[in-house]
Amino acid sequence: MLRQFLFSTASRRLVRPMIAPHRSASSSLDKTEFTTPSQIVDYDDPPHLPVPEYPLRPDEPLETRKQRLLYQSRKRGMLENDLLLSTFVAKHLRDFSAAQTAQYDDLINGVSNDWDIFYWATETKPTPPQYDTEIMRMLKQHVKNEERVQRIRQPDL
């Protein structure tokens, strides 16, 4: 199945660089077309990739949950979210109620693709209703960075 995917046209579209010039068969030699990021952002996940369900932790103490969320916010696997979420958590997490902490936990662990969180927070894509919560609105406000705080590294622990 993997071999079929690797040699399919869908995989070639995924691997093509974001702003790489390419020529179509109908174009002349002096005319070059460019692929824009918006054409690449919206690829659907292949149906053969199962996404495991995140395990719920109903009996987890609030302080333990906050410590786990602090760690998970700093270790996302993509620098953009590492910076946004770690600075957001450093600013707000200690003041979150149990309900707000649960909303934040659902946001960062319920979504299977970190790029979705990034696009929703930067308002590149509309936020689905189930994630359009008070915490998401706070995150969007944080991302706007109206105080013009420099966020080039994660805050100290």
From Swiss-Prot:
<dbReference type="GO" id="GO:0005739">
    <property type="term" value="C:mitochondrion"/>
</dbReference>
<dbReference type="InterPro" id="IPR028882">
    <property type="entry name" value="SDHAF2"/>
</dbReference>
<keyword id="KW-0809">Transit peptide</keyword>
<feature type="transit peptide" description="Mitochondrion">
    <location>
        <begin position="1"/>
        <end position="24"/>
    </location>
</feature>
<dbReference type="InterPro" id="IPR036714">
    <property type="entry name" value="SDH_sf"/>
</dbReference>
<dbReference type="Pfam" id="PF03937">
    <property type="entry name" value="Sdh5"/>
</dbReference>
<comment type="function">
    <text>Plays an essential role in the assembly of succinate dehydrogenase (SDH), an enzyme complex (also referred to as respiratory complex II) that is a component of both the tricarboxylic acid (TCA) cycle and the mitochondrial electron transport chain, and which couples the oxidation of succinate to fumarate with the reduction of ubiquinone (coenzyme Q) to ubiquinol. Required for flavinylation (covalent attachment of FAD) of the flavoprotein subunit of the SDH catalytic dimer.</text>
</comment>
<comment type="subunit">
    <text>Interacts with the flavoprotein subunit within the SDH catalytic dimer.</text>
</comment>
<dbReference type="GO" id="GO:0018293">
    <property type="term" value="P:protein-FAD linkage"/>
</dbReference>
<keyword id="KW-0496">Mitochondrion</keyword>
<dbReference type="GO" id="GO:0034553">
    <property type="term" value="P:mitochondrial respiratory chain complex II assembly"/>
</dbReference>
<keyword id="KW-0143">Chaperone</keyword>
<dbReference type="InterPro" id="IPR005631">
    <property type="entry name" value="SDH"/>
</dbReference>
<dbReference type="GO" id="GO:0005759">
    <property type="term" value="C:mitochondrial matrix"/>
</dbReference>
<protein>
    <recommendedName>
        <fullName>Succinate dehydrogenase assembly factor 2-B, mitochondrial</fullName>
    </recommendedName>
</protein>
<dbReference type="GO" id="GO:0006099">
    <property type="term" value="P:tricarboxylic acid cycle"/>
</dbReference>
<comment type="similarity">
    <text>Belongs to the SDHAF2 family.</text>
</comment>
<dbReference type="GO" id="GO:0006121">
    <property type="term" value="P:mitochondrial electron transport, succinate to ubiquinone"/>
</dbReference>
